[in-house]
Every structure is written in C-alpha cells, then in structure tokens.
Amino acid sequence: MSLASLPEFAALRSHADGVRIPPDASVPLTPRVRALVDSALVRRLARVSQLGLVSLVYPGAVHSRLEHSLGVYRLAVEFLVRLEGDARFATLVGTEDASAFLAAALLHDVGHWAYCHPLEDMGLPELPRHESLLRGLLLDGEAAGILARDSLHAGVPYGRHFDQDRLLASLCLDERGEALAITEKGRTAAELLVFARYVMFSEVYWHHAVRAATAMLQRAVWIVRPAIDPALLMRSDDASFADWLTRTAAGTPAAPLAAGLFGPTRRLFKRAASFDALHHPEVHRAIAGRSYADTAAISARLAERLSARLATPVDPHTLLVDAPPAEREVEFRLQVRERPARHAMGATHRWHRLEDVSPVVRSLAHEQFDDLVKRVRIFADPVPAAAIASCEGLEDIILEAVAG
C-alpha cells in the first residue's frame, strides 16, 4: 500500500474536515487524528503556553502548545507528501511507519509541562525531562512552523521571512538514507530559516526582559526545590504551576520572585550589567556554560562583595547571574545534496553539511550568536540594579566572585 493511501493526504488536499490555526493553515483532521486531538493528554496542551514567560514582554504571545502541535503535525503531513515520490524513501517507509510519524509529530509535546524549557536548562536532578521520540527527525521542520507562528503572535516580522514552500520542495533523504536533507535548490531557504531563528532569539526568545523573567523563575524554583514533586510538575499547566509556585514560595525568599511573575502586579527585575563574548571575553568565559548551582553560588558571593562596595545592600537571593545554555540554538544539522556536473559521466551526488557550504550559517551560528547574543547578564531588583550598573570596577568584582 502506497503512502498516497494515507487518509491524511486526502484530507490535506480536500480541506473538507480540518481546523484552522495561524497564520493561515488548515490542519487536516481524519477520524484517527481527531481521536488523538480530543484526548485528555493532548487537550492539556491547550493550557500550556508555547512561549511561557515571553508573554510578559510580548503580550500577544499567549498561543498554546496545542496550536503548536497541530502546526507540527500539519508540517509532517506536508513532509510525507513531498517525499512520497522519492524512491529511496518509498522503499524505506511504509504506511505504518508514516502513520507512526504523523502520530509522533502530533504528540511530540505531550510530555511538556509548564515552563519546562527554562527549568530544564537548570539541569536539576529533581526536574523531569520532557524529551520526545521523533523530535530530531523533523529536520527542524518544527522550527519552520514555530517561527512564523511565534512571530505572528509576538507581533514582530522577524520569523516570517523565509521560503517554507521552497524548503519543503527541496526535501530529500540524506546520503545514508537515515535523515532528511535538502537539495542545493533549498540552500537559500535554509539560510533564511537560520537567519529567522537568529533574529527571533535575539529579539524575542532571549530579549533582555524575557531573560530577566527567566532568571527570576529559575531562582524561585531553586529556592523551593526541596518541595518539587516531579509527578505533579509533569501534570501541570500554566495556571496550576503558577499556583503551586506562589503557595510553595510563601514565607521564603522566593515569594517576591513568584509574585513579580505571577502576582497581580508585573514586577520584573532590571538589567544591571551585560557581557558578551566579543567585548567582555574574560567575564563571559568565566560564567557562560556553568551549572545553575555554580551561578547561584557566584550570585551569593557577588552580592556580598557588592554590599560591601555600595551604599545599597544587595540581597543574595535577588541578585541573579544569568548564564545562557551552552548549546547552540540557531543552526541545525542538515546535509545539502549537490548534483554532479552535467559533463561528469557516471558521477554521483555530492553531500555537504549546510554550515560547510554556507558562510551565512557559519557567521550567524558562531560569530554572531555565540559571540553577541549569548550574553551573561546580571539582574537585580530595580533599586540595587541602578547602583550596580554604575559601580566602578564591576568586572573585576565579578571575576573575584567567580574565583571565590
């Protein structure tokens, strides 16, 4: 039985039974897909926001993990439609495999609990992981769907300027037939996708105020970590998590942090200092990529030194050193298939990594993102933040705190 017999193919073409999601996509819902979408496991994702704390800075960014999952599933159907005519793919993938792939695309986030990405970045053994089976098999096609939707809801244009249709049309199998790749015709579209991710990280996902909120959430959870119940977290949605953290933080130094994020009044900490790898290599190298336990200890020592230097006392619980995750976020592992020269009789396709044939990707993912966007930042309550920002010799004080 060929892939063309999949009911989702016909549903995609007919638009007869589906649901609409932004920007302007019709998601095909066959009876078997609808049964999954209507299950309690998937419906919980309607109560988990896709961008979490980003909505504190971009108020429109309140779309859900359910909307995102529907978009990834639709993209997976489009992948299969494109690859149906690939002889190698048709040999390797039958209808059962394809059906499992579609189910995995729809269900890839069912393990997502509220605010799990910033909390998983802490690397705490108390916190569960939400990883899902087929995430790596989607060619970062998930990213293609994410960017346009996140950009639309955030009210910014940055994630919508790449040619998704061209990227889909260039899909093929990689050299070993084990993963998705693109033909050389899709290289520019892939470069634009990487650029869109770069700008979205720079201006939205890692906006300095979003990082402030993230640092506040991480410190609050760090303070109350003895009370963490992994099973409860795995079932949480945004509202239940906020309620749990607010109640658990009551009477602890985490209380003002939780209140600033989830209370009736929004109160985000202010940026006291920022250090990128290009202009402040020593401080950046000393802190970036450290464990959360290390940055918490550095924060405490730094607060002690700053309190001795400044007229304003600095609370060690509310001085936050934000070290971005070590993993690179904007490039993706992808092979590009280059066709042989027309005069080369008997020659086969040549294969290259995208970053090896694209100076754009190399520059964005390495020089630009690692050196300029992945900044180490110091956040604090507004009053001490202003004093810290004007503190003379701050870099030396920070390096002393790092050294212990």
Model-derived regions, located:
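Histidine-centered, transition-metal-coordinating active-site segments
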Residues: 1-100, 112-404
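Short alpha-helix carrying the canonical HExxH Zn2+-binding catalytic motif
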Residues: 99-107
